[in-house]
Amino acid sequence: MVDVQAQRKQIEKLISLNRVTKVVKGGRRFSFAAFMVVGDGEGYVGWGFGKANDASDAIKKSLTSARKNLRFVPIRKGTLPHEVIGCFKKAKVLIKPATHGTGVIAGGPVRAVMEALGVHDILSKSLGSNNSMNVVKATFKAFDLVLNAEKVAEMRGKKTLKTLWG
């Protein structure tokens, strides 16, 4: 049996790699914490966090965590179908669809998420906290609010039209 995830190309973006120090009786003990975003460039994206005594082990742990956390986000013509706002704690992310040729106008962590997702044209603004982990989580909360044509037709009590939203 062929693994579906192995067939998909993976886009891996390292958001942050922190060296953490713990002071113990004999001195300082160092460990690493990695935060990554993984996507296939076609609508699937996930985030992961991993901690280990070695940086490469922390990155591997965050990769496996991100692959377990993949979710689908509907993309239409290289952008999101409509505007969404996601909040996580004090981080707030505003994401607006953009016309073809605009590019990814987003800062830091949101840019990495959009590139892993496969979005080519987007306008984004991070408000409030600039903690990269909270900004990514706010972005994923915004993705939970993205509706596709089938969901909108169902909410309105209409038949699904393929012509709705292109």
Curated annotation (Swiss-Prot):
Keywords from the UniProt entry: Ribonucleoprotein, Ribosomal protein, RNA-binding, rRNA-binding
GO cellular component terms given for this protein: small ribosomal subunit
Biological process according to GO: translation
Domain annotation S5 DRBM: ranges: 10-73
GO molecular function per UniProt: rRNA binding; structural constituent of ribosome
Coiled coil regions in record: none
Signal peptide range in chain numbering: none
Record note on quaternary structure: Part of the 30S ribosomal subunit. Contacts proteins S4 and S8.
NCBIfam families: rpsE_bact
Entry comment, domain topic: The N-terminal domain interacts with the head of the 30S subunit; the C-terminal domain interacts with the body and contacts protein S4. The interaction surface between S4 and S5 is involved in control of translational fidelity.
Stated role: With S4 and S12 plays an important role in translational accuracy.
Family per record: Belongs to the universal ribosomal protein uS5 family.
Protein name: Small ribosomal subunit protein uS5
